[in-house]
Every structure is written in structure tokens, then in C-alpha cells.
């Protein structure tokens, strides 16, 4: 019996897959537990439309992420911090500091976990930092740390 999986089923397939399951397995387990529904022409057509809509939505999200990456590449986030001799900072500049300053300076709101900063910035100067905007879309942002007067 052909069924459309509504949830991931171990050993059978992922959500949205159309699979052949034995009649007994489908009637006694998959259908009553609402893990799958019978694959009729109407339900297959609906599934196809849903997948098309999801693909279009994902493409739009990727396009938005690419536009944002382009915009961020032109941004220079300036952060002032207290520093000692040799340009070493008292404390450090974290991803949270960078995101807050980016929001104040440019009005761009991002999640601090998207900033791919391995370790906090501990010295004066400029640094390019990667930002993961979407799966497969990584932007770069320039962060300049200057000495506070």
C-alpha cells in the first residue's frame, strides 16, 4: 500500500516521502497512529503543491540572506573599549557586544549565536568575522575595536 509519511519513520523514510508499506503495517500501525496517510491522487497532488510552496519559501529566505550578507559586508562595526599597553583590552569584546552595536549602528537585528566568533576579541584593531545567515549563506562583517578615551 502506498502511503505518505506525516512524520519520520525509522527504517521506512522521512516526513513527506511516498513509500510502499505492507498492507498490515499501514492499516494496523501507520494509519491509526497518524504517522502516515493513504496516498490517493488528491493527497499526492496536495503534497506536490506543499513541496513547491516550501521550495519557493526556502528560495526567498536564501535570497534575503544573500542580500543581508551583501549589506553586512559593507558595514564596519566600531566598538570602543578600554585598553592597556600593547593594544591589549581590559576584558574582551564578545559576540553579544558586536550584535548589540550592530543593532544600534545599523538597525540590523541578529541572533548572537549566528556570529561565528571562536573566541572573544582581546586586542585593538580590525577583524573580519563570519556570520551564518542561512544554511549555505555565510556573510562577513568588519569589527573595529578602538581605544576608549
From Swiss-Prot:
One of its GO terms (cellular component) is ribonucleoprotein complex. It comes from the Bacteria. It holds the Pfam family Ribosomal_L9_N. Gene3D superfamilies: Ribosomal protein L9, C-terminal domain (3.10.430.100), Ribosomal protein L9, N-terminal domain (3.40.5.10). One of its GO terms (biological process) is translation. Keywords: Ribonucleoprotein, Ribosomal protein, RNA-binding, rRNA-binding. PROSITE patterns: RIBOSOMAL_L9. The keyword rRNA-binding applies. One of its GO terms (molecular function) is structural constituent of ribosome. Belongs to the bacterial ribosomal protein bL9 family. Binds to the 23S rRNA. This is Large ribosomal subunit protein bL9. It comes from Alkaliphilus metalliredigens (strain QYMF). The gene is rplI.
